Amino acid sequence: MSASLDTGDFQEFLKHGLTAIASAPGSETRHSPKREEQLREKRAGLPDRHRRPIPARSRLVMLPKVETEAPGLVRSHGEQGQMPENMQVSQFKMVNYSYDEDLEELCPVCGDKVSGYHYGLLTCESCKGFFKRTVQNQKRYTCIENQNCQIDKTQRKRCPYCRFKKCIDVGMKLEAVRADRMRGGRNKFGPMYKRDRALKQQKKALIRANGLKLEAMSQVIQAMPSDLTSAIQNIHSASKGLPLSHVALPPTDYDRSPFVTSPISMTMPPHSSLHGYQPYGHFPSRAIKSEYPDPYSSSPESMMGYSYMDGYQTNSPASIPHLILELLKCEPDEPQVQAKIMAYLQQEQSNRNRQEKLSAFGLLCKMADQTLFSIVEWARSSIFFRELKVDDQMKLLQNCWSELLILDHIYRQVAHGKEGTIFLVTGEHVDYSTIISHTEVAFNNLLSLAQELVVRLRSLQFDQREFVCLKFLVLFSSDVKNLENLQLVEGVQEQVNAALLDYTVCNYPQQTEKFGQLLLRLPEIRAISKQAEDYLYYKHVNGDVPYNNLLIEMLHAKRA
């Protein structure tokens, strides 16, 4: 699709352009653009009466090219085409994301087209020359306004003081300018340039990947065990008589849970603003320009909402986006969670006689139930989530509770697991062979799928910072229907995506595909969680899992 001009812009160009040409005196002396810029800088410190008026210049602005053809699916090894072998797509829907195919970079100082890396970052030729002359000539400018002049392509020459200040603010390096006035800069910023290029390439890949949104993702190709599949099919008719809405459940287990102080009703704290953060009345749209907000923009829209770029120092030894640091603050204290769950299980076992002792599967269900309590507590106290109203909180949790459980289990194995063992939430290592010898084949197959995912994530060097990002991406799913504040959910998802991308590129530069590989694990986690839900439902209908626990309440709420 060829580039085109908006009718109003074109008419404005004709009007001002022809007027400027008609009124231009024929005897006016014209300087080269470079000379004209130098003269303007020289006059910057003079009083107003000595300044020549700057004629208004109209510029023909070409709108960015928009691709009409949606990008293809991105495979795990970076090619376009079909999904990885262990995934299949049952149905999908294209979302019309507009994006510039070439992702043309704009100068962070004035917004003009960049010409390359100059003194620390991508800038245009004009700002490059201005910065070099200012530093080499040791110029000192003054601002006749309030030192906050707007600097853009059409006004960058009006106030050199504010222009130079913005050059420094956006990251141009004084030490990169050669003092000997020779051409070329100091070649000590090569690693930073290389990392920046890699980051931009990853962003391009993300944008293309986000151009295709899967409306529904099927399960992993490996089918569920035949006995589980047939059992689920056979119980559908019998299950129609089960209550699928919220029912009055016996409060015994909930009362004893160390994570709650009252019978569980999934009640969330009232809607309140985050302390220290601006309210989320606006998030950028999903258009390409705002999907990765320019940290240097000073427009009102860009200043609203939470920006992970704040305080993000790319030159630190291990760069961590500020948003990820905030997400880490929300993480529960793991030893405390372990102690609470262990105390609960010991109390539970002591209240039973020898004949009523829990089976291996029953004990694992109790652990999962208490882990789910801790996950709900984590969500309730987390940044962004507590900004949502209770109804939206309920919908998000009911949608992803099983995925969060699976992700929690998998990360625990990646971080603490040992070869041939399963690391339980209680902090104990149990032999893998011991568990599979006391549970059914269907459960063992689910455990095997999870362990395969553990191996893949270990090979990616999956760490806690990436784990918290994936948790928030799972929790803030824009696929949930009837959300009142969908804009906030989408905005959080976009910002966490961007923070995760920056983190992986800056901290794992040797793994160029890590970001994409991590995102590809999310559909696999969802597929495993779906099978786990079906298995849990099957066991529940057979009477192996009681009603009075959070697992079953959430299971019924999701199926309602």
From Swiss-Prot:
Subcellular location: Nucleus; Chromosome
Alphabetical UniProt keywords: Activator, Chromosome, Developmental protein, DNA-binding, Isopeptide bond, Lipid-binding, Metal-binding, Nucleus, Receptor, Transcription, Transcription regulation, Ubl conjugation, Zinc, Zinc-finger
PROSITE patterns: NR_LBD, NUCLEAR_REC_DBD_1, NUCLEAR_REC_DBD_2
Ranges where the record places region Disordered: 21-55
Disruption phenotype: Embryonic lethality between 6.5-7.5 days post coitum (dpc). Embryos arrest at the early morula stage and display altered lineage specification, frequent mitotic failure and substantial chromosome segregation defects. Conditional deletion of maternal transcripts has limited effects on zygotic genome activation (ZGA). Conditional deletion in the pancreas leads to defects in all three epithelial tissues of the pancreas at birth: a partial loss of endocrine cells, a disrupted ductal tree and nearly complete absence of acinar cells.
Residues holding a phospholipid derivative: Y535, K539
Name of the featured protein: Nuclear receptor subfamily 5 group A member 2
Impact reported for K289R: Does not affect early embryonic development
GO BP annotations, alphabetical order: acinar cell differentiation; bile acid metabolic process; calcineurin-mediated signaling; cartilage development; cellular response to leukemia inhibitory factor; cholesterol homeostasis; chromatin remodeling; embryonic cleavage
InterPro entries: NHR-like_dom_sf, NR5-like, Nucl_hrmn_rcpt_lig-bd, Nuclear_hrmn_rcpt, Znf_hrmn_rcpt, Znf_NHR/GATA
Chain ranges of zinc fingers (NR C4-type): 107-127, 143-167
Post-translational modification: Sumoylated by SUMO1 at Lys-289 during the hepatic acute phase response, leading to promote interaction with GPS2 and prevent N-Cor corepressor complex dissociation.
Protein's UniProt keywords contain Metal-binding: yes
Superkingdom of origin organism: Eukaryota
DNA-binding residues (ranges): 104-175
UniProt short sequence motif FTZ-F1 box, positions renumbered to this chain: 189-208
Result after altering D180A: Strongly reduced nucleosome-binding
NR LBD domain boundaries: 319-558
Residues forming coiled coils: none
UniProt remark on domains: The C-terminal extension (CTE) loop competes with a DNA minor groove anchor of the nucleosome and releases entry-exit site DNA, thereby promoting opening of closed chromatin.
UniProt similarity note: Belongs to the nuclear hormone receptor family. NR5 subfamily.
Residue spans of biased composition, Basic and acidic residues class: 28-48
GO molecular function: chromatin binding; DNA binding; DNA-binding transcription activator activity, RNA polymerase II-specific; DNA-binding transcription factor activity; nuclear receptor activity; phospholipid binding; RNA polymerase II cis-regulatory region sequence-specific DNA binding; transcription coregulator binding
Family annotation (SMART domains): HOLI, ZnF_C4
Primary location class: nucleus
Keyword match Glycoprotein: no
